[in-house]
Amino acid sequence: MEFLVRTENLLPNDTPEELRDELRKGERERAMELREQGILKRLWRVPGRNATIGLYEADDPAALHDALVSLPMWKWMDVRVEALATHPQEKQQRLS
């Protein structure tokens, strides 16, 4: 299944810089692992916000949840997930 995942970083402004750097590093490393596992397909930044939009692929919502909670910044994220279904036009293009 494919999922569109919108995340916004809600890390408090008074978080020590050392902790911020550690979390960012861990987040990058974990994202690369998810890419290597074929779970994280694409990732975009949202201009003007501390937010991302990602295209994820997982067997089911529970597997996606497991991937998301493995992110070091999970507890400071506002996460919105939309399950995606293939549009009929996409199905037709694949057959052509």
Region spans (language model):
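Conserved, structured core segments of small domains
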Residues: 1-96
